[in-house]
Structure formats: C-alpha cells, structure tokens
C-alpha cells in the first residue's frame, strides 16, 4: 500500500485497520465526517482555541 511508507510505525495488526487520516490527524477526520457542522463551529471559535483542542 502506498501510504505504508508514510506511517512506518503503524502496523495493520494493531487495533485492526485504522484509516490513514485518523493516524495522521484525528482532528481533521472529525472535521471531514461532520464537515458542515464543524466548519460552522470553527467560524465562531477563535483559532487559538481550535488549535489548542
């Protein structure tokens, strides 16, 4: 698989199959799943707070 080189420390047998995006950026996955709702929330929250979460 192409992204195996990117995540060398992630083994397929660990915790079953984990989506690459979840490994790379868990917060980003949440935004993608609930895009409209999360993007609306992000507009009302200072960027510093979003990064800190």
Swiss-Prot record:
Please provide, in alphabetical order, the Gene Ontology terms of the cellular component aspect for this entry: membrane
Record's keyword annotation contains Membrane? yes
**Protein's cellular compartments:** Membrane
Q: Does the keyword Iron-sulfur apply?
A: no
Q: What UniProt keywords are attached to this protein's entry?
A: Developmental protein, Membrane
What tissues has this protein been observed in? Mainly expressed in the fetal brain where it is specifically localized to the proximal axonal segments, cell bodies and growth cones. Lower level of expression was also detected in the fetal heart and the skeletal muscle. No expression in kidney, liver, lung or spleen.
Function, please? Neuronal antigen that may play a role in brain development. May be involved in neurite formation or axonal guidance.
UniProt name for this protein: Neuronal protein NP-190
Give the highest taxon in the source lineage: Eukaryota
């Amino acid at each position: 698989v192409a992204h195996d080189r990117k995540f060398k420390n992630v083994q397929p047998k660990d915790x079953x199959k984990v989506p690459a995006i979840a490994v790379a950026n868990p917060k980003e996955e949440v935004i993608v799943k609930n895009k409209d709702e999360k993007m609306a929330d992000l507009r009302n929250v200072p960027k510093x707070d979003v990064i800190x979460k």
